[in-house]
Curated annotation (Swiss-Prot):
Organism: Homo sapiens
Gene this chain is encoded by: RAB27B
Function: Small GTPase which cycles between active GTP-bound and inactive GDP-bound states. In its active state, binds to a variety of effector proteins to regulate homeostasis of late endocytic pathway, including endosomal positioning, maturation and secretion. Plays a role in NTRK2/TRKB axonal anterograde transport by facilitating the association of NTRK2/TRKB with KLC1. May be involved in targeting uroplakins to urothelial apical membranes.
Membrane association type: Lipid-anchor
Record-stated family: Belongs to the small GTPase superfamily. Rab family.
Keyword Nucleotide-binding: yes
Residues found modified as N-acetylthreonine: 2
UniProt cross-references to NCBIfam families, sorted A to Z: small_GTP (TIGR00231)
Motif residue range(s): Effector region: 38-46
Basic and acidic residues bias spans: 207-218
Protein name from the UniProt record: Ras-related protein Rab-27B
Length: 218
């Protein structure tokens, strides 16, 4: 795809404590590489990737294929950058909420991140995927899968255990979030309201019509 040659611009925000592996996770997703030497993110950064999303048609049949430009925002986890991070919440369509499977404290802090997210996101119930990263370090694990799944079930969101080092479930987690977003947009189109930051390319909503400009009712 050339610049501007896409149907949708979707912004995703990676959230979580400093050191949980947000930067390496996003780098694995966009470049399919692992770099353990990334330094701590200062403020906010982003990576980009073009993908094709195949919408589901009636009765589970294949629908139209949409070209999607993903912007994946990488946020600093330190407290001193929290006000800067929350300023980006309202522009994001979906959230990758991450913790470190080798850090119980990063898991406990998921609740704090959820509170901030719910208070600052574009709607009360945004699309979120919970991610337990560093699944490649089982000997150092401090958070068991049952704990994490119970928390995800409490919030009604999908949960994945991932590894930026091996690539385990990295694509699957992002693809699941994108699918949630696109399905929400389809529902919002039916109400003639979608977030005005979404459409960035040549076509309009999921039916190829001109997109409305209001934010989605969630």
């Amino acid at each position: 795809m050339t610049d501007g040659d896409y149907d949708y611009l979707i912004k995703l925000l990676a959230l979580g404590d400093s050191g949980v592996g947000k930067t390496t996770f996003l780098y694995r997703y966009t470049d399919n590489k692992f770099n353990p030497k990334f330094i701590t993110t200062v403020g906010i950064d982003f990576r980009e990737k073009r993908v094709v999303y195949n919408a589901q048609g009636p009765n589970g049949s294949s629908g139209k294929a949409f070209k999607v430009h993903l912007q994946l925002w990488d946020t600093a986890g330190q407290e001193r950058f929290r006000s800067l991070t929350t300023a980006f919440f309202r522009d994001a369509m979906g959230f990758l909420l991450m913790f470190d499977l080798t850090s119980q404290q990063s898991f406990l802090n998921v609740r704090n991140w959820m509170s901030q997210l719910q208070a600052n996101a574009y709607c009360e119930n945004p699309d979120i995927v919970l991610i337990g990263n560093k699944a490649d370090l089982p000997d150092q694990r401090e958070v068991n899968e049952r704990q994490a799944r119970e928390l995800a079930d409490k919030y009604g969101i999908p949960y994945f255990e991932t590894s930026a080092a091996t690539g385990q479930n990295v694509e699957k987690a992002v693809e699941t979030l994108l699918d949630l977003i696109m399905k929400r947009m389809e529902q919002c189109v039916e109400k003639t309201q979608i977030p005005d930051t979404v459409n960035g390319g040549n076509s309009g909503n999921l039916d190829g019509e001109k997109p409305p400009e209001k934010k989605c009712i969630c």
